[in-house]
Amino acid sequence: MAIKNEQKGICWIDWPEELKDRHSKAVKEAEKELAEEIEFYRFQQYCFTTQWRKLKAYANKKGISIIGDVPIYVALDSSDAWANPEMLQFDKDYDPKAVAGCPPDAFSATGQLWGNPLYDWKALKKDGYGWWVQRMTHCWNFMM
């Protein structure tokens, strides 16, 4: 978020090349320059996690289970897409080769085009679907 704010909110695929491609030097410089804002976001995440754990413990103590779902697709303009472009079907300029949607059905005569980039399952398989394992493990631990 800090870099996105610094870039006036534009999508990461339109950032300067050194940031878009996550060049180590540029990312380290951004971390240094934006350290205060980064710490603010870390603090927000800490506060949310602390409050979530208290709420969940209270609900569980009262016999209430809290469940949620995990979105299957990531947004084009997401930290997941920026940090892991190799797991998605992008061209050399990070434009999606294909996007998610669904065909016409009872809810939409024209179908739906969601715009989420599709996964590159061959690339994900190379490390045993590590991104998915990490994502599901985090969600499981967060809910349990």
Regions found by a protein language model. Name each.
Residues 66-68:
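Hydrophobic faces of well-ordered beta-strands that scaffold small-molecule active sites
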Residues 1-53, 73-144:
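Alpha-amylase-like alpha-glycosidases and glucanotransferases acting on alpha-linked glucans and related
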Residues 60:
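Anion (oxyanion) recognition and catalysis
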